[in-house]
Amino acid sequence: AGMTSTVFAQSDDFTTWTKFKVNYKIDPRFSLLSNLEFRTKDDVSRMDRLGLAIGGEYRAYSFLKLEAGYETHFRNLGDSEWKFRHRYNFGATASFQYQWLKIVLRERFQQTFDRGDSKARLRSRLKLAYAPEKGIVSPYFSIEIYQSLDDAPFWRADRMRYRPGVEIALAKRWALDVFYCYQYESPKGKHIAGVEI
């Protein structure tokens, strides 16, 4: 057992994710979304990827939002080799609140194209947050399951993310999100320190 735990500990990586978001509200129901993201890897010693995303969000009901978007990633493969990959996604997010507890359920389909290959995944996320009527600080915890839609058995988790964090409202439509995320994707895990603004 000791040997097994040592192997897993050695395979874990420590990384950072930093995301800058710009959202533009066209009308009460429709918003344009964009973000720029930087990720590191190998114990924060190297750049992992630079990502750019654009998309749209439509509030169908007070509790339901529909989304669609496109992303491109410039990824570091090592040995001075970088490559682009492309991804599109669409999904739905349902939000419910009872007193101070906010519950958010999101289902997202994504397909990634990488040098002629494609990979389709379904991402299911549950988020629980403390959301008081007054106050700007909202701690939360989320769990996200990635399921492969290609040749893997559907009910096998391809990747798992566990993410505690704190959102701080800086202005009416501007918030700071500071989080820790543990990602497990066989055979190794990732410890991620992140900031989104």
Question: What name fits each language-model region?
Answer:
Residues 29-34, 63-68, 98-103, 134-138, ...:
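Repeated loop/turn-to-beta-strand initiation elements of outer-membrane beta-barrel proteins
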Residues 9-16, 40-49, 77-83, 113-120, ...:
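Solvent-exposed loop/turn segments connecting transmembrane beta-strands
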Residues 10-67, 76:
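Start-of-domain marker
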Residues 92, 190-197:
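Outer-membrane beta-barrel "beta-signal"
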Residues 24, 58, 94-96, 130-132, ...:
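Residue-level signature of outer-membrane beta-barrel architecture
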Residues 94, 100-147:
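Detector for outer-membrane/organellar transmembrane beta-barrel domains
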Residues 36-42, 70-76, 96-100, 109-113, ...:
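Transmembrane beta-strands of outer-membrane beta-barrel pores
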